[in-house]
Design a protein with these regions (language model features):
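Beta-propeller-forming repeat regions
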Residues: 25-33, 38-512
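Bacterial Sec-dependent N-terminal signal peptides
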Residues: 1-30, 34, 38
């Protein structure tokens, strides 16, 4: 059934391309039509100018050819995979057995892309300028004496305590007030999400941290000190939302199964005390976060999801009757953008939720510093049509937190970059944008010298010291995803720093 499904998908691609050729202008060059046809069948067409020739030639085009069934003796898409995983990949149909493009057209398409691509990306020699961060006081935290840090979970519970998990599956609670660490449990593999709701704790393990088509992720539940496992095995889940969407008194579980070549957004409805029924809401890889919010004022909570692989997009899934959903993509991004996170907040105070996105995931086949990485503000016109109104460039941007951190009535932002330009701007791994004028999108940017002490991977915000203002918490993951200066890499791995708490000094307990 799976093979038939993907053969049908490839047939649809061919039909789409046929009509695009049929409707194209006779004056339009064939190579342009080929690019606009084949490069839009699964996602929006990237700008050829967004990547240099070498990356197109050595990384992108060979993979693109494999996905169109073109065999290349210099490139093996299955290299490094075990036989059993190759079998799983073959069943997906991602790499079709028969070519969907002729050899002549494939040669023409490659030559066109290489001829149009720049030798290198234009560099903006004007660096971001930063002020010294004074509103927040950096407070480094170490959980143990072990050098390096591999934190994969950073959340807060209802008592403002930090919940942390690591690559080894260890889960613990950290009380900032007394610096006490309390173990919660050991779950075998990297922990990526944690939720406490209605007396039940939900713990999500990704399974394979590295890209894989194997499904080995799990959700554990803890109730009355008894740990159980939801029977369904998941494909690299990275985010779990536990929420009573239809307000019937029973929580649903919405799981972002990031996957790899394939993936999905899944809904689990409880059948009995042990079993769940699974429904697929989005059948595409790279789902990284989902938020529940009524987006059309019909009294039903909808789902807003970010997908970050290939067809990078924000989708609103409008809730219908009987927990059915109607999906609408409201934002689409180039497949080379590296979408990483989003937030939903009413930026301009007009009563409609706007979307804040960051893109900068650079641990892929196209590693190079990219001037289009950064944060974007997309304003809602009131009918869930979103338009980009502001862009703040930041190499390798991966997370954003949005709040009125200085309590002056507008929205400020905290940004982290897991893939900054460490050679020239290591301090840009964290940036605080203080909003000076929300109407003109005027911001002052701040950072702190100690920001280079960790490779910031996760970020959260909460009033962790209970003094009335919102603090920012950063966690470090010192794995070398991408090239890093040797001195900096040594600094991370000779240090036992795990967290950096940016304590907001706007309000102190002495003032209360």
């Amino acid at each position: 059934m799976t093979k038939l499904k993907f053969r049908f998908h490839n047939s649809i691609i061919l039909i789409t391309i046929f009509f695009q050729f049929s409707c194209s202008s006779p004056k339009e060059k064939r190579e342009v039509v080929l690019f606009n046809s084949y490069c839009t069948s699964c996602h929006i067409a990237p700008s050829i100018q967004d990547l240099p020739k070498e990356i197109w030639a050595t990384n992108i085009l060979p993979e693109m050819g494999a996905r169109m069934g073109v065999r290349d003796s210099t490139y093996n898409p299955f290299k490094g995979f075990t036989f059993s995983e190759i079998n799983i990949i073959n069943q997906t149909g991602v790499y079709p057995l028969d070519p969907i493009i002729s050899a002549a057209d494939w040669k023409l398409l490659q030559e066109y892309i290489i001829s149009m691509a720049p030798v290198s990306l234009e560099k903006d020699n004007s660096k971001n300028t930063y002020n010294e961060l004074v509103q927040f006081t950096p407070k480094p935290i170490s959980f143990d004496s072990i050098n390096g840090s591999f934190i994969t979970l950073l959340k807060l519970d209802h008592d403002h305590k930090l919940i942390c998990g690591n690559i080894s599956g260890e889960l613990w609670e950290f009380d900032f007030s007394n610096q006490k660490i309390s173990p919660i449990g050991q779950f075998g593999k990297a922990i990526v999400d944690y939720t406490e709701l209605d007396g039940i704790t939900y713990v999500t393990s990704i399974g394979d941290l590295h890209p894989s088509e194997f499904s080995s992720g799990q959700i554990f539940t803890i109730e009355n000190n008894i740990t159980a496992r939801i029977p369904e095995v998941l494909h690299r889940p990275v985010h779990t939302l536990v929420h009573d969407l239809d307000e019937n008194g029973t929580n649903e579980i919405i799981v972002s199964e990031f996957g790899n070549l394939t993936g999905k957004l899944s809904l689990f409805k409880k059948v009995d005390s042990v079993n769940f029924k699974k429904e697929i809401l989005l059948n595409q890889p790279g789902t990284i976060r989902v938020i529940a919010k009524d987006m059309n004022n019909d009294g039903k909570e909808d789902l807003i999801a970010l997908t970050s692989q290939g067809n990078e997009s924000i989708t609103i899934l409008y809730q219908q009757e009987n927990l059915k959903f109607s999906a609408q993509q409201v934002l689409r991004f180039s497949p080379v953008y590296g979408s990483s996170w989003f937030d939903l907040i009413d930026y301009n105070g007009d009563g409609f939720d706007d979307i804040i996105t960051v893109n900068g995931d650079n641990a892929d086949k196209s590693y190079v510093q990219k001037g289009y990485h950064g944060m974007r503000v997309h304003l809602n016109d009131g009918s869930n049509n979103f338009e980009e109104k502001y862009f703040y460039p930041l190499h390798g941007a991966t997370r954003v937190v949005s709040n009125d951190f200085d309590q002056d009535g507008d929205i400020d932002f905290g940004l982290i970059s897991t893939f900054p330009d460490y050679e020239n701007e290591p301090e840009s791994s964290f940036v605080y944008l203080e909003n000076k004028n929300p109407d003109t999108f005027s911001f002052s940017a701040y950072t702190f010298d100690a920001s280079k002490l960790g490779r910031w991977f996760l970020m959260n915000s909460e009033d962790i010291d209970d003094d009335g203002d919102i603090d920012i918490i950063l966690s470090s993951f010192t794995y070398a995803f991408t090239p890093v200066p040797e001195l900096l890499y040594e600094l991370w791995n000779e240090s036992n720093l795990d967290l950096m708490i940016l304590e907001n000094k706007l309000i102190t307990k002495d003032k209360l």
